[in-house]
Amino acid sequence: MSLNPSRPSSSELVELHVFYVPEGSWNYKLNTISIEVINNFISAGFIRVSPQLTLQALRERLGEFLGVDAVAEKFLFLKCIGNNLAVVKEKQESELKLKSFAPPYALQPELYLLPVIDHLGNVYSASTVNLDEQQSVDDTMEIDGTIHRPDSLSLSKDEPGDPSLLENTWRDFPNHEEAEESQPTQQHFGNPRLPGSLEESDDCLGNVKSPFLWKNNDEDEGEEDDKATINRRQAKLVCDKEHSALPDLIDFPSFPSQRVSSRLVDTSLLKIEREKIIEQMKQVKEERKYLENIREELIKKVEKLFEQSKSKRYHACDSWKKKYFDTKKVTASLEEVLTKLREDLELYYKKLLMQLEAREIKMRPRNLANISDSKNYLIIQITEVQHAIDQLKRKLDTDKMKLILEVKMRKQAASDLQTLRADLTQKKMGTPFRSPIFSGSVPT
């Protein structure tokens, strides 16, 4: 396609960042790549071009923008469709303009290029790219401004997958003029005046999906491209009937052997790492089992000690209760005897006072002056004081008994509180056993 002679102003130009897909990232099986790995692409620089410029025209001038060293010899344009990058075909290169690679038509002003891998000299593999989708410079000869191609390019049906046959065919290509049995080979690519058999052969090769790409350096005019397209479509029907096909991708793999060896090394390393992880997991499981056994043994010891302490508390509490109730039974009879003795003592005290008072009355007329100094009066005072002392002693004994009982009750309450705290601690730790609560209520 011819370029527009009128150069646009700088304000009308768009800036595009050019990226190369690194080797090994392209998915040759699906013939695509996800946009998630765009961050791993290799930058080739940026260009300022007209948004109306087509990809076909940019292919011819890309070396001027980025430099010959920065541009790959053979490459394909990629376009972002959804979440993946797809290959742009040759026919689409003449239709797509650079404005479709910049906002608002695209998320980012970026242009992606896929270098084509060289395996058999002039033969290039790019998965399922057709002959119409890519041109190769090394596969054609330019003489006096015209493109020449051998008419014996189609392979034999008996050997469709032999790469040596194809390689030998291209080795004999420079000497095709010396062969007497071959047909005239000078022809202009896409000329509608070509012989029918040669045009059908070329179009058949162009419509069959193959891993081989051919480069055409001739810039055809728009009308000639349309005529060539019509001729290729007409010859496609003849090609389908003849069932002529090129070798499959299996005969010419696109992946180098170094990549396969690196994958094997990576696989072996992954296996080694997996075995190490499995060994570590086994060791961790064994350590866990050992620690669980130790934990079970410690729990059993704690339960045993807890049972022993619980039995000691039960025994002490039971013995104390037994002594208390036995003492209480004996105390009941003793209290009855004590009450009776106290009553007798009170009666005896009252009788003694009555006798002393009667004696005092009889002796009063004789000793009116020394009543306070009489012997009988002193005896009465001594008896009253002795009675008061006895009452104080009895009160002291009663208070002492109450104090002893209260001390014992406080000790029992402190023991119960300690037991409750131990139970609460066990519950917080989540132990399966639980200590009982002893309520030592002693009747008074």
From Swiss-Prot:
It holds the Pfam family SPATA1_C. Residues 145-160 have a biased composition (Basic and acidic residues). Keywords: Coiled coil, Cytoplasmic vesicle. The keyword Coiled coil applies. It comes from Rattus norvegicus (Rat). Residues 268-403 form a coiled coil. InterPro entries: SPAT1, SPATA1_C. One of its GO terms (cellular component) is acrosomal vesicle. This is Spermatogenesis-associated protein 1. Residues 145-229 are annotated as: Disordered. Interacts with IFT20. It is found in: Cytoplasmic vesicle, Secretory vesicle, Acrosome.
